[in-house]
Amino acid sequence: MKKIDRRKAIKNLTIGLGGATLLSSPLSGFAHTKNNSKTIPSREFGNPNIENPVTVITLGAGGRGNVYGNYGIQFPKELDIVGVAEPISIRNERYTKKHNISEENRFDTWEHVFDRPKFADAVIISTPDNLHYGPCMKALEMGYDVLLEKPIAPSEKECLDILNLANKTGRIVAVCHVLRYAPYFIKLREMIQSGSIGKLISIQHLEPIEHIHMSHSYVRGNWHNSKKTTPIILAKSCHDLDILRWMIGKPCKSIAAYGSLKWFKKENAPEGSTNRCSDGCAVEATCPYSALKIYNDPNGWSSVFDLPDD
């Protein structure tokens, strides 16, 4: 059976991991339609037919870093995690043990990874949104291919810098817009492009963020303040913007956006509420956003925490 080269394997692997490639030049392994949109080649997961797995360093061993790491556990012939950079010690230790990473390839910050000569094929960047730009630019400079969590970066300039450097170096930057690979959206795009449901005039789109997810991520969580991290239109709805553009298949002529904080404000707090749910809040028992219920339930959101094994 014919073996495929590792460069092509990396390009194909980004599809399995859910990456939309950020390169202006066509990539081998993709078919192109008349409007130059890329279609997904069929492939069997777990059977890449390469001599050695693609070696990868994970920058950020949180939820997303572990999702991609688990792919390596499930398909070790495709992906081998050989390094990790993670400042939270319990995450670093668990990820190192899980993937049998050598001590010399453990780092407490992404910068230290690049103090070493290149020692893997690619890096997975699953750091917080405002820590995408630095490691991505450095990885490209050193010749790594990159699997980059969405959004690409907080600013237009940073996004363009990454695009330009990817083109200059010829390296792969695969952005994790995973909805492009969901059967639902693939079929919907096919119907729109074929005209089988008629001519597209307008789209009414709703991002239905579930209420607990909303309170966890965008009220209490890492994205609670748009001045400290990316706003919700990037942190969450970059998926929506990408999938709409992809399904329509035409460039945007103009964009307008507006928004503000409406509900989670002090003046809307119910009578008897406290700063924290655990401070004797009078309405905690009936509150749909109660942290005590959300995080104490073993079948709920407790999995988002790095709890000790005991």
Residue ranges and their predicted role:
Residues 101-165:
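Beta-loop-alpha module in the N-terminal Rossmann-like domain of NAD(P)-dependent dehydrogenases
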Residues 78-96:
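NAD(P)-binding Rossmann-fold cofactor-contacting core
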Residues 25-63, 70, 74:
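C-terminal segment of N-terminal export signals and the immediately downstream linker at the start
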Residues 58, 125, 148, 173-175, ...:
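Hydrophobic residues in well-ordered beta-strands that form the structural core
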Residues 2, 7-32:
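N-terminal export signals
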Residues 83, 122, 202:
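Short, Asp-centered acidic motifs that coordinate Mg2+ and/or phosphate
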Residues 65-68, 132:
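N-terminal Rossmann-fold NAD(P) dinucleotide-binding loop
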Residues 62-65, 172, 179-310:
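Predominantly a Rossmann-like dinucleotide-binding segment in NAD(P)-dependent oxidoreductases
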